From Swiss-Prot:
Residues 457-731 are annotated as: Interaction with p53/TP53. Phosphorylation at Ser-99 regulates the E3 ubiquitin-protein ligase activity but not the SUMO1-protein ligase activity. Phosphorylation at Ser-718 increases the E3 ubiquitin-protein ligase activity versus the E3 SUMO1-protein ligase activity resulting in increased p53/TP53 ubiquitination and degradation. It is found in: Nucleus; Nucleus, PML body. GO terms for molecular function: antigen binding; DNA binding; DNA topoisomerase binding; SUMO transferase activity; ubiquitin protein ligase activity; ubiquitin-protein transferase activity; zinc ion binding. SMART domains: RING (SM00184). This is E3 ubiquitin-protein ligase Topors. The gene is Topors. GO terms for biological process: DNA damage response; intrinsic apoptotic signaling pathway in response to DNA damage; intrinsic apoptotic signaling pathway in response to DNA damage by p53 class mediator; maintenance of protein location in nucleus; positive regulation of DNA-templated transcription; proteasome-mediated ubiquitin-dependent protein catabolic process; protein K48-linked ubiquitination; protein localization to nucleus.
């Protein structure tokens, strides 16, 4: 061990073969043997040399720790350990072949402050053995427990003793220390405590003498405990759902669980289903053979169940458990062999036990989680009348199915929270379906809309409709989805629809157009009076054909729209309009298949396919080339856009109320009021995105988008003809009225341009609606205006542009006929927009347009009776002009369209909001190739619209080139709702409205008698339509 010779008598000297000191051999061997036994280790500490042992003599047998430490100190000196406490190191390098005693057994490095254990005297580094003792107070070498450590040994009487604290003494040898074991680990103590009669009686049974359910069944100790099952059911039903949230059944005392399980066995209540989320385990015998570890989870459950069955008979529990665990790997749990082995023990409870055992074995849960997710089905065995509710432990939504069989009412009551159960399973009748559908719809969109007042009656009314019943059949076998109203936040996709103009969507667009039309109609019928009433009533009253199909589709759609509207629209509704409200809700149409019904409606009613959306689509491509034909055919593509813009509302209403008679002035007016409100709302909803609300919140250039509802045009042509008196705005959009007219249909072609114009159109129309609503004392005027102002952002932008062009508002008529026809017709019903956008209103008229636009928007209804009452006191005349632009184009390409006779309707609206509709129908067949010059009609009250493309005079005069006026028609006092008219509303600020109603190829000249003249230099709009002239007075 280095160059320095080890001291004589040291262990190393002996190992190197040096002669030991002279001592009595026998005594030395005896003492060393004692030390060896004491160390009980092959590598005993060589602290005591033979010489030391000899010197100690007989004192060794009673060696004390002090003596040992003294000898150890001597040995340290001989081994050249440093005398410094805590830093003693071997001063010389330990050779590679040094004895294991020369290194610390724990760190396998040189000793650092050599220390000795009090019992075995094994040497370790003090720090190493100290840390070791914190974990286990056992010698790492001999595994003997120790209580103290001797360290810092300098001399026999100079050392330190480190006494272990009791906390560190946690070795297995200490009987006071209890080792951690899993609850499923069976130890003697546990087996004794679990199966001893005393412990079993105290812990596992209800009462000390409990003998188990089996023995109760045999009559040994029968206790009628079935009476308690309702109480247990209620208790567990209350605990079950809460445990899934926060609590666990562990908090429920074992006794309660045992009692509950015992009660279930007594009553024969079995687990019906497990809320396992579709997960399950393999329980085949082969699986258990391959995976014996999976058997462990079965043990706790088996012990509990067998304890429930056998009670205090612990021996039976052990025997049956052993049999079960042995057979699980032999037979399948469902096999007859497995059951037959248990029948001698379980007797009449065998099937029940096997059912419960298989349910638990299949489930992916442990015992506690299984109890939480288990659904129990109580048979009607006891006197439990209340068990229908309490018998089934509702712990999971799956139990709804369980309860379904027990009680329909309870299942229906659970419908709101049970999402997994389909609607039809809840309802047993139509009304129930309706209620459930309303609940489902309300959950999908907003409960408020469907639950709002009158919704239930509306839903029922809709059910009465055949179309609604058809929808219910189509949507689901039993459930009628009356309305599907999505939140406003989820309705933005309509913008996307507006942008999409492809003709490929023809039928789809048509459907969407119908939806949008109805939606817009509901809003353009704003108060949902027009849209709803006109769809179910006015359509029925005016066009029974259209009303039939339309009412059907409207009814379905109205159910949705009306539901939404019932909440959204404060405006008063007629009972029929109330139905229509749902129908008219544009969002409902969009989201519902009601749009399809409307599209079918539109298809049936508009043979030419004037669907505004389709017309828009075709209008884009063909409007430039085929104005008249695009009016018809492109009404489909446009219709889609119109739908997007809620123009389809008007068009659908127009086609529905094509025969709608303006004579029903008050009805139309109330409708227009309500439709104004609805329009504005729908527009505000649909066009919030389009309207730029600028600083013109106060200053709206009212523009009336005229819904010319021409029966010939199927109401699709009833497009919003927004006439902006401020021609400058339109000028920038399109210099010529023809272009504007085209732009309506071209909007499909020029999406960008159409989009901006559309925005402006929406804005102006919105403003005009708001203005008209302000002026028209319609019940919906207030909310409508609010709605109009809602999208005011874009509208403001548009208005700013309008104001920039013209601050002064020219007569509302000029503005309306010009601006709306040109720009908004394009946006609403491009096909219908053909001619009227020729003239623009002055700046003043544009300002008024803004106002009228809001009103217009509000008044936008199926029979676009602009309840524009100029001033509240003034009698405003609603002039409805058919969209000649679309007709004009369509006429160019289709002469047959011109064959339809134009209808002119003059509407007088009192300050009360009632407008008398006077329509003079004068049909003269003759071609009038008479172009109308700019400013041909400068009369404030007279607006002439011709189908030919007209050029808007910048002085707000409309020049229309008459291509061929084969027919001129003047409609006077047309009260019958059956009169097919495409209504374009020309509104004046002075509450003067001119409406031109013309067939697809008819020219309408509207002369409005204002309650007071409009202070506009020119209010004449001339448009030329091939083959027909319509003069309206």
């Amino acid at each position: 061990m280095g160059s320095q010779p080890p001291p004589p008598g040291s262990p190393l000297s002996r190992e190197e073969g040096e002669a030991p000191p002279l001592v009595p051999a026998e005594e030395g061997r005896r003492r060393s043997r004692r030390v060896r036994l004491r160390g009980s280790c092959r590598h005993r500490p060589s602290l005591l040399s033979r010489r030391e042992l000899a010197s100690n003599g007989p004192a060794v047998p009673a060696t004390a720790s002090s003596e040992i430490m003294a000898s150890a100190a001597k040995e340290f000196k001989m081994d050249n350990f440093s005398p410094k406490a805590g830093t003693s190191k071997l001063q010389q390098t330990v050779p590679a072949d040094a004895s294991p005693d020369s290194k610390c057994p724990i760190c396998l490095d040189r000793f650092d402050n050599v220390s000795y254990l009090d019992r075995c005297l094994h040497k370790f580094c003090f720090r190493c053995v100290q840390e070791w003792s914190k974990n286990k107070a056992e010698c790492p070498l001999c595994k003997q427990p120790f209580d103290s450590i001797f360290h810092s040994v300098r001399a026999e009487d100079d050392f330190k003793e480190y006494v272990l604290r009791p906390s560190y003494n946690g070795s297995f040898t200490n009987p006071e220390v209890r080792r951690f074991r899993y609850r499923t680990t069976m130890t003697r103590e546990r087996s004794a405590s679990l199966y001893s009669p005393s412990s079993t009686v105290s812990r596992r049974t209800t009462t000390p003498p409990d003998s188990g359910v089996l023995f109760e069944g045999l009559g040994i100790s029968t206790r009628p405990r079935d009476v308690d099952i309702p109480q247990f059911m209620r208790q567990m039903a209350l605990r079950g759902p809460t445990t899934t949230d926060e609590r666990s059944l562990r908090k429920i005392q074992e006794q309660d669980i045992i009692n509950f399980r015992r009660t279930l066995y007594r009553a024969g209540v079995r687990v019906r289903s497990i809320e396992d989320g579709g997960r399950y385990r393999d329980i085949s015998a082969e699986f258990f053979r391959r995976n014996p570890a999976c058997l462990h989870r079965l043990v706790p459950w088996l012990k509990r169940e067998l304890t429930v069955l056998f009670g205090a008979h612990g021996s039976l529990v052990n025997i049956v458990q052993h049999i079960i665990m042995s057979n699980v790997t032999r037979y399948d749990l469902e096999s007859q062999a497995f059951v037959s082995d248990l029948r001698p023990f379980l007797l009449n409870r065998t099937e029940h036990f096997i059912h419960e055992f298989i349910s638990f074995a299949r489930s992916p849960f442990n015992m506690a989680a299984f109890d939480q997710h288990a659904n129990y089905d109580c048979p009607p065995s006891s006197e439990e009348g209340s068990r229908s509710d309490s018998s089934v432990i509702t712990i999971s939504p799956d139990e709804a199915e369980t309860q379904e069989l027990d009680m329909n009412a309870s299942t229906v009551r659970q419908a709101p929270w049970d999402d997994e159960t389909p609607g039809p399973s809840y309802s047993s009748s139509e009304q129930v379906h309706v209620g459930v559908s309303s609940l489902l719809n309300s959950s999908d969109s907003s409960d408020e809309e469907l639950v709002s007042g009158g919704t239930t009656s509306q839903i029922q009314g809709v059910q009465t409709n055949d179309d609604v019943n058809n929808d219910s059949d189509s949507s689901s076998d039993n459930c009628v989805i009356v309305g599907f109203v999505k939140p406003l936040a989820e309705r933005t996709p309509e913008l996307v629809e507006l942008s999409s103009d492809s003709e490929e969507l023809g039928p789809y667009e048509k459907v969407e157009t119908v939806k949008t039309q109805e939606q817009e109609q509901s809003y353009s019928s704003g108060d949902s009076d027009v849209s709803r009433a006109s769809s179910p009533r006015s359509v029925l009253g005016k066009d029974e054909q259209m009303s039939k199909s339309h009412c059907d589709s409207d009814t379905r759609i109205s159910s949705k729209k009306e539901e939404k509207r019932s909440t959204s629209l404060p405006a008063p509704r007629d009972s029929s309009s109330t139905r229509g409200d749902r129908v008219c809700s544009p969002y409902n149409h969009r989201h519902r298949k009601g749009g399809r019904s409307r599209s079918s409606d539109s298809r049936s009613q508009s043979r030419s396919g004037h669907d505004p959306r389709n017309h828009r689509k075709h209008g884009k491509k063909r409007l430039r080339n085929k104005r008249s034909r695009s009016r018809e055919s492109s009404s489909r593509p446009r219709a889609r856009k119109d739908k997007k813009r809620s123009r389809t509302r008007d068009s659908s209403w127009s086609r529905r109320s094509q025969t709608l008679s303006l004579s029903s002035g008050s009805t139309s007016r109330s409708r227009s009021r309500s439709s104004d409100h609805g329009k504005r709302r729908s527009r505000s909803r649909n066009r919030d995105r389009y309207y730029l609300r600028n600083n013109y919140g106060s200053k709206y250039k009212w523009e009336y988008t005229y819904y010319s509802r021409n029966k010939d045009r199927d109401g699709y042509e009833s497009s919003y003809r927004r006439r902006t008196l401020s021609r400058a705005h339109y000028s920038r959009q399109s210099s010529s009225p023809e272009f504007r007219i085209q732009s309506f249909s071209e909007r499909t072609n020029a999406r960008k341009k159409n989009h901006s114009e559309r925005k402006y159109y929406y804005y102006e129309r919105r403003r005009s609606r708001s203005v008209s609503s302000n002026r028209s004392r319609t019940t919906s005027a207030g909310p409508d205006r609010v709605r109009n102002e809602k999208p005011g952002g874009k509208r403001k932008y548009k208005t700013r542009h309008l104001e920039g062009t013209s601050e002064e508002a020219q007569p509302a008529r000029e503005f309306t006929s010009k601006g709306k026809d040109s720009h908004y017709q394009k946006s609403k019903l491009d096909g219908s927009y053909k001619n009227e956008s020729d003239s623009f209103s002055d700046s003043r008229s544009s300002d008024r347009e803004t106002k009228h636009k809001r009103r217009r928007r509000r008044t936008r209804s199926l029979s676009v009776e602009i309840v524009y009452e100029g001033k509240a006191t003034d009698t405003s005349k609603h002039h409805k002009k058919k969209k000649k632009k679309h007709k004009k184009k369509h006429k160019k390409h289709h002469g047959d369209n011109t064959s339809r006779s134009p209808v002119v309707i003059t509407i007088d609206s009192d300050s009360d909001g009632e407008s008398e509709v006077k329509a003079g129908i004068e049909c003269s067949n003759g071609s009038l190739p008479q172009p109308i010059q700019d400013g041909a009609f400068e009369t404030k009250d007279v607006v002439t619209i011709e189908d030919e493309l007209g050029v808007l005079d910048k002085d707000c005069d409309v020049t229309a080139l008459a291509d061929d006026l084969s027919t001129s028609q003047t409609v006077e006092n047309c009260d019958s709702p059956a009169v097919p008219v495409e209504q374009t509303l020309d509104v004046r600020e002075e509450s003067t409205f001119a409406s031109d109603l013309e067939s697809q190829s008819s020219n309408v000249s509207i002369q409005a008698e204002p309650s007071r003249p409009v202070p506009s230099p020119r209010t004449s709009l001339s448009s030329v339509s091939p083959g027909r002239d319509c003069d309206v007075s």
